[in-house]
Amino acid sequence: LRPDLRYATGNVIFKVSGTVIMSQPPVCIAALYRFTPFADPAALRASLLEACLQHGIRGTLLLAREGINGTIAGSAEGIESILAHIRSLPGCDALEWKLSWDDAMPFNRMKVRLKREIVTMGQPDIDPLAGVGRYVPAAEWNALISDPDTILIDTRNDYEVAVGTFKGAIDPDIQSFREFPDWFRARRAALEAEGRKPKIAMFCTGGIRCEKSTAFALSEGVEDVYHLKGGILKYLEDVPEAESLWEGECFVFDQRVTVRHGLEPGAYDLCHACRRPVSAQDKTSPLFIDGIQCPACAAERTDEQRARYAARQHQEDLARARGTHHIGGDA
């Protein structure tokens, strides 16, 4: 957003120098992060939460000594105000953010949480401010990953990769970003055994995980490291579907669940037991029970957990029938 934008009610009408340039649905969603040293992140929490509540913003923001990360949603005016507030924080003038739009609010409440890391890798010596891989804009990404000398790595979790990834990408098959360093070390050892020193290109949803994964690769002595600037979301926003090398949809951590090219809402729902994406085919499985379990987590749940999920689902169904929202929702 820019200071000279103007808004109308309903669909948001953007004007720059009096010229209408686009219209969007009424809910603006901002995915943002910035690595910067905060001496006392706890001191920033109260004013940030107050500003978000004042502007009707919902979502989650994480604060740590290494910076800020999160996804928030609200009116375009409200998001513009909060982005300005965050950019006024120490070292946040170069805040990275991406906008998308929806007809419905994808979050139930506003949370500002204090964390050890804004994205958890479990490698305290890795500092993206000390050096990361080379950023590759979305417009140049296809050429890089089409090069046979490039090894393409998806740094996301297994359930994210399952709904979509780039053609030819390696899936580390990890359940947590904490597992990535060990996987990478093993993969690098295998490449060295083959006598290969390829270019390594990495990608993730919005770019933040690659700040750490490429910094980690550099710390391991890998020299030719690249990552997709703005992540998958920027690629899906900027690259026409006819030219795209992306296959499937992109998982996002809010009630939209997935998005497609143009950042249009995808076709997946969310399992409220395990928080994994659920496809239309998954719902035909006898293991799927709405709000209680899906095929991916059916074997992981106890009868006590299922009973608790069933009670929660009953409350949500009652709230929906009344036309209200059940405050016990997770997002």
Task: Report the location of each language-model feature.
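N-terminal amphipathic/basic-hydrophobic helices that include classical n-h-c signal peptides
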Residues: 1-21
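Short, well-ordered loop/turn elements at secondary-structure boundaries
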Residues: 146-148, 196-197
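Short boundary motifs at domain starts and secondary-structure transition points
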Residues: 20-23, 142-143
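Rhodanese-like catalytic fold shared by cysteine-dependent sulfurtransferases
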Residues: 23-132, 156-201, 208-331
